[in-house]
Amino acid sequence: MQAHPLRGSLFEKLVVLEMLKARINAGLAANLHFYRDSSGLEVDVLLEAGNMIRLFEIKSSQTINQESFIQLNKVAAIFGERVVKKVVLYAGQEQQKRSNASVLSYLYAGEAATNEVTPGSAHETD
């Protein structure tokens, strides 16, 4: 499956379904959106909660590099201060706090989608 041409797409769907399942089971609105603008700029999941937005990029690789953050940061620039959290969910096991986003294992996708983000909380982007 590592080299299968549909690996990335299937992995992304698995992660989004886990996020959706966690939100529904927690009694939260299932407000997960895919974002793409007219120029092709996209992010895998945009989660709106009131006026706040969390952005998620999903990667099927087991390592993260700087390219993993490019789309995330460009979309965050469009929404400005409304973005309170940027997360890369990937197939690896390590959790990291980078200067521009959090990096979480896909195993935490449900938790990342259900933790409510409020200004000043531990989940707010620095």
Model-derived features with residue positions:
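A cross-kingdom feature that marks ATP-driven nucleic-acid transaction machinery
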Residues: 1-126
